[in-house]
Amino acid sequence: MQFDAVLLLSFGGPEGPEQVRPFLENVTRGRGVPAERLDAVAEHYLHFGGVSPINGINRTLIAELEAQQELPVYFGNRNWEPYVEDAVTAMRDNGVRRAAVFATSAWSGYSSCTQYVEDIARARRAAGRDAPELVKLRPYFDHPLFVEMFADAITAAAATVRGDARLVFTAHSIPTAADRRCGPNLYSRQVAYATRLVAAAAGYCDFDLAWQSRSGPPQVPWLEPDVTDQLTGLAGAGINAVIVCPIGFVADHIEVVWDLDHELRLQAEAAGIAYARASTPNADPRFARLARGLIDELRYGRIPARVSGPDPVPGCLSSINGQPCRPPHCVASVSPARPSAGSP
């Protein structure tokens, strides 16, 4: 399978204070999120000057990917400029016939995979009859470079705290009903499997997995334990240092720089716990190599690169033109409330 271009498909984020509220309205449209909730989340962005780190990180990643291979790379987002519809229309106008789509989410499930498939279908409709064929690359939660980047980040973070620090992985929580209906439990099982792979690569036998950034009505069950509750429990058990690894995120979303670097760090300091946060891949050159490797799997018919571990968890396959890659695993059975301003 040959490609004329690559599309980096991401979530999007504001790049100035005046963009924050319109961005959040895009994210939550049709979900009945109260205005006061939007105001609260807006403050997280305004704390950083109204700028999400994600677009800048993605532009650097695109430059790295263009340096590593010969195909032009287009940039499209779901919720803010540059929109995916505009990117696909530009591809059409530039004569692109087939493009590989690399989404900035490593997982299967509705929020982390199927919504990107829906983005592809919507963008092709907007581009019309001459829209390019769009091939979404497979999820990569068990790719050797994904595991390597997080393992190295844990090692680097561990060097900043005392040697007996407890390792805590985090990923974005979702409603348990949404998790059951996709897979079932494909997202949470993939996250748990990836934590085992990364922990082993980093040399850890004991670790915790917690979930972060939930919202919505308290009566609606979400994946647990919440990382704030987990930290409270660790403090009660006498743990005096933690390394937090946000394995659910491939870049520094607001949920990372606010929920972890700000709120969770303050909680740890108040409890007398030394705190270190492992880096996400962001624009690490290895992340671009990972994307290039996924493209080459399809271009040259290569066997998918995966780290083998006990009790492996299946993932979705590549998909074409917004068609579900594996319907039992990636169905829009529910539209879970957007947890805050991001997505797993």
Curated annotation (Swiss-Prot):
Cofactor: [2Fe-2S] cluster
Pfam family of the protein (one): Ferrochelatase
Gene3D superfamilies xrefs: 3.40.50.1400
Keyword presence, Disulfide bond: no
Keywords: 2Fe-2S, Cytoplasm, Heme biosynthesis, Iron, Iron-sulfur, Lyase, Metal-binding, Porphyrin biosynthesis
The reaction(s) this protein catalyses: Fe-coproporphyrin III + 2 H(+) = coproporphyrin III + Fe(2+)
Binding positions (Fe(2+)): H172, E255
Leading EC class: lyase
Subunit composition and interactions: Monomer.
Family: Belongs to the ferrochelatase family.
Function: Involved in coproporphyrin-dependent heme b biosynthesis. Catalyzes the insertion of ferrous iron into coproporphyrin III to form Fe-coproporphyrin III. Has weaker activity with coproporphyrin I, protoporphyrin IX, deuteroporphyrin, 2,4 hydroxyethyl and 2,4 disulfonate.
Designated name of the protein: Coproporphyrin III ferrochelatase
Naturally occurring in which organism (per UniProt): Mycobacterium tuberculosis (strain ATCC 25618 / H37Rv)
